[in-house]
A protein has these predicted regions:
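Active-site diphosphate/adenylate-binding microenvironment
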Residues: 7, 11-72
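Conserved thiamine diphosphate
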Residues: 9, 89, 137-192
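Short coil/turn connectors at secondary-structure junctions
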Residues: 17, 44-48, 86-92, 114-120, ...
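Glycine-rich beta-alpha junction loops
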Residues: 54-56, 126-128, 179, 202-207, ...
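Thiamine diphosphate
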Residues: 54-130, 182-184
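Electrostatically charged, flexible surface regions
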Residues: 194, 203-310, 314-315
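Conserved small/polar residues in nucleotide/adenosyl-binding loops
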Residues: 324-329
Length: 335
């Protein structure tokens, strides 16, 4: 008798816990997107584990009707690595913030990415330490004034994309908290990707860093300051879809289609599956006079650490078993 496939709804992933984030915090939106993405992918709640470190975003496991572990500061990636290696059948998610992930947890993060462990890493980036009440973080811009930098920071920030791709990451995406549709789409793609996926979500902290991303998230000028990349599609953006990205020598350039001799044919087509990450890194680093790249920037398949470990264990166990068969024992002693 055939069993009917269960159709999960977003509510199936919601726990009964009161959500304790501040009203207006961007984390609320990301949580809702994750509920919707999981329902879309169809991962059973009992086949999902959500791991986190310490920080505002790291409270998320409490709000998921799944297995979860609220661990210690910066160590979420290490715990998630162990969970996935021990239970490769689970969909394992790492929820982390810019401080938790890139400061005390930086080493665990880059090695989880380098090893290509099949983890879904969601990096909430609000460029501030919110839980400890407003200190600058590893992603805060140079000159940023905070409680721990009253005269402005004198250091340059980490750029999560540069770090993830530099660690040989095979999946990197960027989303914004106010774009629920596309953020849900990205998280669903992250869940389907086999290997380490890193999704940076630009979130707003209404209390300690309000409006930090408004130059690209406000609807008034979002279309002209961001470009949403889709594999196989032209890199076009703008309120009138009249701007595009072209290659000018060894650099990317934003042009207006129909001006200065540029046509639609000159505009680059996004190839998220290209194994060479050179162009992906260039796209991920855009900003300033160039639009900030959103969407799935890189999505490449590669062998995963967790599968390789289990394949190696199986191979070694089979060899050990052979030692205890009579034929193998005879061969071993030369009979």
């Amino acid at each position: 008798m055939a069993t009917e496939e269960i159709k999960y709804q977003p509510k199936d992933y919601k726990s009964d816990q009161y959500v304790r984030w501040c009203p207006g915090c961007g984390d609320h939106a990301v949580l809702n997107c994750l509920h919707k993405a999981m329902a879309e992918v169809g991962v059973a709640p009992h086949n999902m584990a959500v791991i986190s470190g310490i920080g505002c975003s790291s409270r998320l496991p409490y709000y998921m009707n799944t297995y979860g572990f609220h661990t210690i500061h910066g160590r979420g990636a290490a715990i998630a690595t162990g969970v996935k290696t021990a239970r490769p059948d689970l969909s394992v998610w790492l929820i982390t913030g810019d401080g938790d992930c890139l400061a005390i947890g930086g080493n665990h993060f880059i090695h989880a990415v380098r090893r290509n462990i099949d983890l879904n890493i969601v990096l909430f980036n609000n460029k501030i330490y919110g839980l400890t009440k407003g200190q600058y973080s590893p992603t805060s811009d140079r000159g940023f004034v905070s409680k721990s930098s009253p005269y402005g920071t004198v250091e340059d920030p980490f750029i999560p994309a540069e770090l993830a791709l530099g660690a040989r990451g095979n999946f990197f995406a960027r989303a914004i908290d106010v774009d629920l549709k596309n953020t849900t789409e990205i998280l669903a793609a992250s869940a389907r990707h086999k290997g380490a996926s890193v999704t940076e979500v630009l979130v707003n902290c209404v209390i300690f860093n309000n409006g930090i991303h408004k130059q690209i998230t406000d609807k008034e000028f979002r279309a002209d300051r961001t470009i949403f990349l889709r594999h196989g599609e032209k890199m076009i953006y703008g309120a009138n879809n009249d701007k595009g990205i072209v290659l000018d020598g060894l650099k990317l350039k934003s042009v207006t289609i129909g001006q200065d001799g540029y046509t639609l044919d000159d505009v680059l087509v996004h190839d998220a599956h290209c194994k060479d990450n050179t162009l992906h890194l260039m796209l991920a680093m855009m900003g300033g006079d160039m639009p900030v790249a959103l969407g799935i920037i890189r999505d490449v398949e590669a062998p995963t650490y967790d599968e390789a470990v289990h394949e190696q264990l199986k191979e070694v166990q089979e060899k050990i078993c052979l030692l205890y068969t009579s034929d193998a024992a005879d061969d071993l002693i030369g009979v």
